[in-house]
Amino acid sequence: MLEGLYKRKKTSRFDVLFYIVAAIFIVLALRLLTLQILAGGYYQAKAEGNRLRMVTMTAARGIMYDRNGQILVGSRPAYTISIMPTGKALDEGEVAKLAALLKMKPEDITKKVNDHKYGYEPIRIANDISMDVVTTIEEHRHELPGVTIDVEPLRYYPYETMASQLFGYVGEVSEEELEELKQKDPNTLVSGGTILGRSGLEKLYDSILRGTDGGKQVEVDATGRPVAEVDRKHTVPGSNIHLTIDVNLQKAAEEAVKNQLDQLRAQGIPAQGAAVVAMDPNTGAILAMVSAPEFNPNWFAKGITTAQWNQLNNDKNHPFDNKVISGEYPPGSPFKIITGTAALDLKKVTPEEMIFDSGKHWLIDKRNAEGEALGWLNFNKALAKSDNVYFYEMGNRVGIEELVKYAGYFGIGEKTGINLAGEAAGNMASPAYKRKVFDEDWYLGETFDAAIGQSFTLATPLQMAVMLSEVANGGIKYRPYVVSRIDNKDGTPKEIFGPDKLGILPVPKNIMDLVREGLRDVTNEGGTAGDLFKGFPINVAGKTGTAENAHGRDHGWFVAYAPYDKPQIVVVALVEQGSFGAGSAGPIVRDVLAAYFNVPVNKKSNDTNSKSNKETATGANTANGQKPQNTVTSGQPRKD
């Protein structure tokens, strides 16, 4: 009996053990079933993901050509250094070695890697690496697991700073931008490493210039080092665009600006910057566009350093601004073209009427520079000598309402419509503007100031070019443009752009002929630019100007077209805090015209202190109960 009881207990123990073992095998079998069958696809994909990497291949951006087919902006092959993510923490020693080879800070590399959010895509660390550095990295490859070297197209600006605000710059898409783009469109073609246009034409035409990135699927070893290419999707280059810019004229304008700014600064004149635009008055095509100071877009293409960024961002002269389209300045004496047109057209004065300049106006104590009195003047002589007393009287006769109307005919206070981002509209002084902004009455003295391009009036250099083009071409207003053609992928034309007529100046030809004659005499002997153009072989019509600046020294203007009888080109120059227009902006315009017509220049003709270079003007005052102005006029005499 005891023996039977013992056998039953023994059997029970074996039964329990059997059931336990059986249960374990069942659990293992179920787990194996899950791994191999139910979740097999998931784990196979994960294994493949650890073994295979998709490497983005950046497409070459489209080329920007000048009007004659010369390359302005292109791409060139360059070595790039990337790190292939392994899912493991970075080795500090390896990071330090790579940083030393690339002359980077280790923390900058670590930040790039830590900020990376998109799985196993390579992380670009540095662009445009020299062959010497590439060779050294190859020699230390065993010490730098996961580091890869590729050849990619790098955006290249062969003329460096030339027309940098116009061309713009590019940069790699950031992690934040990429995440935002993928949220908006999960099928976006933008991926890690894609190069985007950031400013200027690069940004405006980014979708055309960018093209389509490709990629290659590579097999990597345990260290993340590529060992074989599995598949490849080829890139599709971006489309090319053709500009109206003439590279030779652009270079001449750039050189003229640099030389003149250097000369002015050497004379103690703190000229801060400049803007120059050359335009075909018969089409609106932009031939050259300079805004100084400039920046080097190659810095951004390679990956701008903190020091470089701080240098540009802290520059008080705003190198990123395209001052041709966004800089707003009092137009000064070139506005007398509009005042004179209005006075003649409204028959407020005849060309022959003589007005006596005693050095100041007889209604309000507004004076010429240094109290200079020019005596009896008709319209032609007043415009050629830029006499303010004469044009104060024209403002008095015409009135502010008519001045506003005629300024509108010439585009003052409205955008030109050029297809560039950031264009400013400027402003035309008026009682309505003063009431809206200051809630104050308008005074006659402000009409006088508006008549000579002061008061609240502001204009961009491009607006002044459009205004002068209307004068030069007989009264047609054209929309300025800088892109003449967009190509298909095969290089054939896709879109062609040309002259766009916006309107006709409602002023008779005989009136405009009188204005043009006055502008011609500006550059002749006795005119405010007579010394500047003495001996110049092309007959030039122009206008000097010195715009009062409430924040420092006066700005200098010069606007011109040539030849006088059959205009081919309009050139406008503005020198910030350059003082008298004839001596600051004038030489720039003269040199650009000389380059365009391929004629020599007599540099000795530039005499900034000669009598013919003076322009008469005054600031606001309180004579006859007139209220002082709130802005822009300084109250000091000024010259052209």
Task: List the predicted regions and their residue ranges.
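Periplasmic/cell-envelope proteins involved in peptidoglycan metabolism and beta-lactam response
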Residues: 1-304, 328, 401-411, 531, ...
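Beta-lactam-recognizing serine transpeptidase/beta-lactamase-like catalytic domain environment
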Residues: 2-5, 11, 73, 219-232, ...
